[in-house]
């Protein structure tokens, strides 16, 4: 991270772009790219990754749709809406920093009052570094492994909130460290103008990781004493040094000679400087159940990044990458495959590793060796969580009667798990609503029911009831209003033309309602709003669902719980709707009947998954709920043998819209073929009967004649 110097105000040509950002709408990519290059050097303001490596978008330094103060876990729903048009509050951000930052804004002490002006905002003891107001170089050091280390409280909080030591960044920084360090070495050996030019090119504002490069350069100039403090370096290193050091270096630089270089002159009191370099240790410890360590819990967003499973049940050796999704919200992963290939085993492996020792002893009745793949004596599960350097590990041994491992004793995340059988509770069952961090019993025991929705909703205070009901209402396909009558102890669901009690709804409705309520019941132990964070595992997400809801379920859950990481399984392709590239993995079996996973699947751009559904994985056709209305209107117009001019124009407009989703062909050849096929389907839909072979052949012949002209 480096200091960014930008214009105080943005050009008015970007007003529409910034308005799109405030409303979280799709932004014009061309304008966005120009905006990023002009004001932010084409890089993320925080991690310095370039737009050619990762997609950039617009960030609001102080979040404008509610703010979570990570220092105390308090959510402020009305902060900082009044700053949405303040240019000083707008920065560039990559999708991964945006996902980590979310609506976090750490403040030491009281947050500013609603509608506070700049004079009052300045008094907020903000702990997130502002690249345009602070000097980030003073807060960070680096090493050859690519890790970034903080030198201040602000530095520590910023590293945590933005997850600046995430795997991809560490790997990229390590490579840049090696290359730039080698360049400095070559310059120190030869003092060649060529290498000096190379160094200066590497620290141009649009170059990657300038903060890291400035650190390396300062090490060579100041600590290693191999490179003189040249005039060209003063604007680069000035903010990393104390004023006295800059003055001393500048004075001595005027007296420099080749003899001085050869004799390796000592430029500053390095013993004094070394004392300022902190002990390089990252404190990963935190515990979701520890009331005295909530700052550490709220300070980082934690998702599963990677998992390695070795000799667990039917899985011999499997690695899964959860970082392929580039969503700015929580990443999903849908495990797709036939029954018996190990989908459920993956969910159980995750739950077993993350639930914490207390829940493991309470829920898991099997011994560790009973989970081993038949014929093997050792196994393991390793999960890498974002924000943690070391994985959480569980070891399985044929001689062990207790689960062993590393970092697995305490719960690190809120986690819920549901098996393929999700029973509703019977009235006579005793309810248990005590605080819990892991609710995964149903994943291991199908007879453990979901929450008693009516009883639970009636038990909530008004604030909690309103939060839970909003989440449930957002899952329904039709508009619904949930209400309760605490005198008569009933919960009602008001639809457009009916008013029903919970027990009068269909089993599918009741199951979805119970699932959402179950999730909220656990999440509210740490979170007070819809931005709850955690991990939810669902086996056979399509179970009990009507096909229409099946198509919508992912989008609905993403909307209701945008910050929760869902890992689900299905063998129904309709459940893929709402997922983006990197959020689907297919489980298959090899010739030895061993399960393996593939995540290299056709792109889901515009959610065109026809290639997947007609591939060796399925061989089914696909439907897009977003486009149903377009297709309905398109086929209706095509079914008219003599459309008027207005209808012809509408057909052309619909074809243009469908072309954006590559639904009417991308070449002239494809377009004529699609026209023939669409005409066929239009007649079929109109008459509800198939065209004869002769009629269909005539359509194809017309298309052929077109190319013969």
From Swiss-Prot:
GO molecular function terms listed in the Swiss-Prot or TrEMBL record: ATP binding; ATP hydrolysis activity
Highest taxon above the source species: Bacteria
Tagged with keyword Hydrolase: yes
Keywords for this protein: Antiviral defense, Hydrolase
Disruption phenotype: When this gene is missing the Septu type II system does not confer resistance to SpBeta in B.subtilis.
Pfam families: AAA_21
Function: Component of antiviral defense system Septu type II, composed of PtuA and PtuB. Expression of Septu type II in B.subtilis (strain BEST7003) confers resistance to phages SBSphiC and SpBeta. May be an ATPase.
Protein name per the record: Septu protein PtuA
Gene this protein is translated from: ptuA
